[in-house]
Amino acid sequence: MMMNSFFPAMALMVLVGCSTPSPVQKAQRVKVDPLRSLNMEALCKDQAAKRYNTGEQKIDVTAFEQFQGSYEMRGYTFRKEQFVCSFDADGHFLHLSMR
């Protein structure tokens, strides 16, 4: 009786070990319209200036990252306070996070 269940289980383990590894998935890179990214940067600077009670000229945006359904801009104030602006896939401002 034990032999009847042993062979199918053993065959299953052998077949599982023979499967090929799944291909590595990579994020798709879509070229962002320069005008859109400049508008997003201006909006990010405006929101950060309001949050930190300073002028836009004292805000630096240092990084722009694109994710599957959103964008993030990282930056800091002249006092070295870091923040992240988040945007949806269409470039609409979502929120500003202080870091």
UniProtKB/Swiss-Prot annotation:
It is a lipid-anchor. The keyword Transcription regulation does not apply. InterPro entries: YsaB-like (IPR025728). Keywords: Cell membrane, Lipoprotein, Membrane, Palmitate, Signal. Its main location: membrane. A lipid is attached at residue 18 (N-palmitoyl cysteine). It is found in: Cell membrane. Residues 1-17 form the signal peptide. A lipid is attached at residue 18 (S-diacylglycerol cysteine). It comes from the Bacteria. This is Uncharacterized lipoprotein YsaB. It comes from Shigella dysenteriae serotype 1 (strain Sd197). The lineage of its organism: Bacteria, Pseudomonadati, Pseudomonadota, Gammaproteobacteria, Enterobacterales.
